[in-house]
Amino acid sequence: MTEPKRAIVLLSGGLDSATCLAIARNAGFDCYALSIAYGQRHTAELAAARRVAQSLDAREHRLAHVSLGEFGGSALTDSSIPVPIEGAVGGIPVTYVPARNTVMLSIALAWAEVLGAHDIYVGVNAVDYSGYPDCRPEFIAAFEAMANLATKAGIEGARITIHAPLIRLSKAGIIQRGTALGVDYAQTVSCYQADEAGRACGVCDACRLRKAGFEAAGIPDPTPYR
């Protein structure tokens, strides 16, 4: 009897990570969903992650805690920094959380080693992204190289692969792909400042990208807006 293929899927509760989970499942993996409470402004996305993990049949869903909010430095972790509502203005925005994807992928890598999983999925995107340096293909390639140098599995020849299947897709393309795979986007939360019920502000950069994506995809937007 062959061992099941296992993959760790980073699951924020947003549109992209939900699509990523559906893609990993469709690729035949037993999916172990990992959400991170890092000190973000709201917990609505973590509640969304629980819903998505259940509806997309994750084998297990874990919530890890790391206190990036202790350091601040981002509008998503420091309530004294306002979330921009004027749209993207160029450069690295204040919604960038320093080292967030590096930290999250490192935690995913630790769980992967424990489970004997050699595949990690992350929903980063370099097309409709907001200027985050840790959403670029170069970052993913560099982290994968590090993972294969820094782990027992890598040293023993079991190659670790970081999958970023959305990295070249537009937001519309992501939505179309996820819809075809049965993702219920009404369960997801993308807004940077959603209320505790998960209702979106409709004006932050994440909301703008989400709205435009559904419109371009020709699919009704199920997002509840305040």
Curated annotation (Swiss-Prot):
It catalyses: 7-carboxy-7-deazaguanine + NH4(+) + ATP = 7-cyano-7-deazaguanine + ADP + phosphate + H2O + H(+). HAMAP family: QueC. Keywords: ATP-binding, Ligase, Metal-binding, Nucleotide-binding, Queuosine biosynthesis, Zinc. Pathway: Purine metabolism; 7-cyano-7-deazaguanine biosynthesis. It comes from Aromatoleum aromaticum (strain DSM 19018 / LMG 30748 / EbN1). Pfam families: QueC. Zn(2+) binds at C191, C201, C204, C207. PANTHER family: 7-CYANO-7-DEAZAGUANINE SYNTHASE. Belongs to the QueC family. One of its GO terms (biological process) is queuosine biosynthetic process. Binds 1 zinc ion per subunit. ATP binds at L11, S12, G13, G14, L15, D16, S17, A18, T19, C20, L21. Its cofactor is Zn(2+). Catalyzes the ATP-dependent conversion of 7-carboxy-7-deazaguanine (CDG) to 7-cyano-7-deazaguanine (preQ(0)). SUPFAM superfamilies: Adenine nucleotide alpha hydrolases-like. The keyword Nucleotide-binding applies. The gene is queC. Its EC number is 6.3.4.20. This is 7-cyano-7-deazaguanine synthase. One of its GO terms (molecular function) is ATP binding.
